[in-house]
Regions:
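Beta->alpha loop/short-helix hinge microenvironment recognizer with preference
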Residues: 1-107
Length: 107
């Protein structure tokens, strides 16, 4: 959830996209429609935000962010968080996965 929030906030703070801090509501879903393990995050994001002067500004575009830009930012942050968690021991590698395989998945 942190990777999603930080990605949205950092990109939308850029005047090229919004230049403001948006409102964000996020929900973590851990299952898919077929009741299989499928963790994913849904985010509702306001179509505007609060600028540095404290004013609400509307989005300049029909979409807040280009898909590729958000995808790259989120993937980079998520892989970084996962790498740090594995390195620190906060996230344990599954027994049948080697450290090399885990590392290759995160790069």
């Amino acid at each position: 959830m942190t990777a999603a929030r930080e990605s949205l906030e950092e990109l939308l703070a850029d005047p090229k996209y919004l230049g403001a801090k948006p409102g964000i509501i996020a929900a973590l879903h851990t299952w898919g429609r077929t009741v299989c393990n499928h963790p994913h995050v849904h985010c509702l994001v306001t179509a505007g935000g609060i600028d540095p002067a404290g004013r609400f500004v509307k989005s300049k575009h029909s979409t807040l962010l280009p898909y590729g830009v958000l995808h790259a930012k989120f993937r980079g942050k998520l892989c970084d968080f996962l790498t740090k968690a594995v390195t620190s021991g906060d996230l344990v590698i599954p027994p049948l996965m080697t450290a090399a395989k885990c590392h290759s998945l995160l790069n």
